[in-house]
A protein has these predicted regions:
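A short acidic, often aromatic-flanked loop/helix-cap motif at beta-alpha or helix-coil junctions
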Residues: 14, 67
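Amphipathic, hydrophobic secondary-structure cores in small proteins
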Residues: 15-59
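Core SAM-dependent methyltransferase catalytic element
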Residues: 69-75
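Short amphipathic
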Residues: 3-10, 35
Length: 75
């Protein structure tokens, strides 16, 4: 799936990926997709919870070694 915005949070640790993801989502229009990459061990669960709390949809989660990439659709 194509993303409308890409956010690279590799090398950043909690809570920085959450703050940056929240700001990036706020910049999107409803229906647009954000691609977030991170290597913080807590990032996958933290970003899933953030999306759920804000009412957005996690479309896909991809793991490659220590890095996780999530596609989040803004509602």
């Amino acid at each position: 799936m194509k993303s409308d915005k890409i956010l690279d949070c590799t090398g950043l640790y909690c809570p920085e990926p959450i703050f940056r993801t929240r700001m990036a989502i706020d910049e999107l229009e409803s229906g647009q997709v954000l691609e977030v990459s991170a290597d913080d061990p807590a990032a996958e669960e933290d970003l899933k919870r953030l999306a759920a709390r804000l009412g957005h949809e996690v479309l896909e989660v991809k793991k490659d070694g220590d890095e996780v990439t999530l596609l989040i659709r803004k509602h």
